Swiss-Prot record:
Binds to 23S rRNA. Forms part of two intersubunit bridges in the 70S ribosome. One of its GO terms (cellular component) is cytosolic large ribosomal subunit. The keyword Iron does not apply. The gene is rplN. CDD domains: Ribosomal_uL14. It comes from Lacticaseibacillus paracasei (strain ATCC 334 / BCRC 17002 / CCUG 31169 / CIP 107868 / KCTC 3260 / NRRL B-441). This is Large ribosomal subunit protein uL14.
Length: 122
């Protein structure tokens, strides 16, 4: 579960390497987010020459969490790291490549472009 002040690895080539969560979107008292949730974050580490710069405020969708997510069949999906993909206002990714696997739960949240760019969908 991702909450305020959580640091996430960025799983795309938008130029950001690490982001810090400012807010989990979806309600005024929402405390935590899981796979497929949108967060507002600031860029803490960035590569030179990238699309996004350090200290930019961006929106991102969570694609991997250590705590995992429960599926309808009762199974759980967990990853080794917490990661997100930076998105535009229309929920399309800012980068052109996605690194690492993403969860199947992203299909339900209108993130098909991220699912199609990902090398592996678990």
């Amino acid at each position: 579960m991702i909450q305020q002040e959580s640091r996430l690895k960025v799983a795309d080539n938008s130029g950001a390497r690490e982001i810090l969560v400012i807010k989990v979107l979806g309600g005024s008292y929402r405390k935590t987010g899981n796979i497929g949730d949108v967060v507002v974050a600031t860029v803490k580490q960035a590569t030179p020459g990238g699309v996004v710069k350090k200290a930019d405020v961006v929106k991102a969708v969570i694609v991997r969490t250590k705590s995992g997510a429960r599926r309808a069949d009762g199974s759980y999906i967990k990853f080794d790291e917490n990661a997100a993909v930076i998105i535009n206002a229309d929920k399309s990714p800012r980068g052109t490549r996605i690194f690492g696997p993403v969860a199947r739960e992203l299909r339900d949240g209108d993130f098909m472009k991220i699912v199609s760019l990902a090398p592996e969908v678990l």
